[in-house]
């Protein structure tokens, strides 16, 4: 995960990968926005300690990881 900062090239590649592998770009964008909104409220509530990473950046990384490694998901 991201701790001290953001590798912008890696973030761009992850975002492009999410869009490229999706069947619907709009729904992917909505998923990213929804996840970012959740992370923003988690930050506000003090549940997350990684406040140096913006919620949208964190959402892209999380969704990209879920897409690339589906075996890590519970269930």
From Swiss-Prot:
E.C. no: 2.7.7.6
Gene Ontology biological process: DNA-templated transcription
Enzyme class: transferase
Keywords noted in UniProt: DNA-directed RNA polymerase, Nucleotidyltransferase, Transcription, Transferase
Catalytic activity: RNA(n) + a ribonucleoside 5'-triphosphate = RNA(n+1) + diphosphate
One GO cellular component term noted in the UniProt record for this chain: DNA-directed RNA polymerase complex
The organism's place on the tree of life at top rank: Bacteria
HAMAP family to which the protein is assigned, alphabetical: RNApol_bact_RpoZ
Function of the protein: Promotes RNA polymerase assembly. Latches the N- and C-terminal regions of the beta' subunit thereby facilitating its interaction with the beta and alpha subunits.
Name of the protein in its database record: DNA-directed RNA polymerase subunit omega
């Amino acid at each position: 995960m991201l701790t001290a900062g953001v590798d912008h090239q890696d973030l761009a590649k992850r975002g492009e990968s999410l869009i490229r592998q999706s069947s619907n770009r709009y729904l992917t964008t909505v998923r990213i926005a929804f996840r970012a909104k959740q992370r923003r409220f988690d930050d506000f509530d003090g549940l997350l300690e990684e406040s140096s990473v913006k919620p949208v950046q964190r959402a892209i990384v999380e969704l990209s990881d879920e897409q690339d490694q589906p075996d890590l998901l519970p269930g």
